[in-house]
Amino acid sequence: MSEQIVTPESSTPVVPNKEAKINLLDLNRQQMREFFKNLGEKPFRADQVMKWMYHYCCDNFDEMTDINKVLRGKLKEVAEIRAPEVVEEQRSSDGTIKWAIAVGDQRVETVYIPEDDRATLCVSSQVGCALECKFCSTAQQGFNRNLRVSEIIGQVWRAAKIVGAAKVTGQRPITNVVMMGMGEPLLNLTNVVPAMEIMLDDFGFGLSKRRVTLSTSGVVPALDKLGDMIDVALAISLHAPNDTIRDEIVPINKKYNIETFLGAVRRYLEKSNANQGRVTIEYVMLDHVNDGTEHAHQLAELLKETPCKINLIPWNPFPGAPYGRSSNSRIDRFSKVLMSYGFTTIVRKTRGDDIDAACGQLAGDVIDRTKRTLRKRMQGEVIDIKAI
């Protein structure tokens, strides 16, 4: 695992400036109100504009009919609503859609998963990933940069625009958001938290905090910070029943071991209402690596002090990976052991694997990792991950 990451970008300025238009997708509601105040307008104008932006997926000020023409003219001079564009779309036979979304000169991937009673969007937080988990395709691409707020919430906006805005169709285009796409969300708190605030805001997408899930591999100091910043559902990428295996497949474990990680999880649960007292454990099933019945018993003992439900994830292959997918029989035996201890255990249904949209398969378009250090020096201060 790389010991260094690029620092998150500084907060977006909210002072109107004709020389550099502000992308309103970069602003949460508090920042939007400050922006309108600095524009000489009443704060409620921010709520009006946000409603147009997120309820109607409107990016044209002239279409905001309850806003006077003078203000619309002002907004066109100093602001814009610019979501990242879809440059490629792939549709799976099971209804899953994967969009390649342009962020600058690179791409990230966003996945839309429709079901009978919900529609889930899997959102990326970084271009690439620094954590180098051995079973994940994204990690093999290396890390390039953090996404801005507008590039994170813009994925939700763009998907809602394509599927159909709530005020247009009469129903929510997206009911759940999972921060489980490309990147480690906790290494981009500066931008991930405001984006999630917009997802939850009634003038944003208005999602329940129980329907916005952040998944982390275990950046413990940032997880402790998260608990003081926002309350959303938490999923943890555990994937191993002991430190020996986790050190190998999830290298950040060498810095923050399982005991330290689970301690931070329990602290988050104490502060959270969204999780209703328990966390979701994600456990990818790797053939003869972490999927034996002895591993299941170890996992049950490990988690006995952590209220949780367990999602077993059949591993999704990618070229050059050194692993195999566990057989259905091994997954079934593993699941039965966990249930014998009283754990709620679910085997996740694989969706979108025929278009490389399943868990662990997102790759996007990341510049060759051999240039990582040079890129970091060019893009901003390089800091030690311990500082996060």
Swiss-Prot record:
Residues where [4Fe-4S] cluster binds: C129, C133, C136
The organism of origin for this protein: Salmonella agona (strain SL483)
Role according to the record: Specifically methylates position 2 of adenine 2503 in 23S rRNA and position 2 of adenine 37 in tRNAs. m2A2503 modification seems to play a crucial role in the proofreading step occurring at the peptidyl transferase center and thus would serve to optimize ribosomal fidelity.
Active site annotation, chain numbering: E109 (proton acceptor), C359 (s-methylcysteine intermediate)
Cofactor(s) this protein requires: [4Fe-4S] cluster
Protein name: Dual-specificity RNA methyltransferase RlmN
Listed GO MF terms: 4 iron, 4 sulfur cluster binding; metal ion binding; rRNA (adenine(2503)-C2-)-methyltransferase activity; rRNA binding; tRNA (adenine(37)-C2)-methyltransferase activity; tRNA binding
Family annotation (SUPFAM superfamilies): Radical SAM enzymes
Known EC number: 2.1.1.192
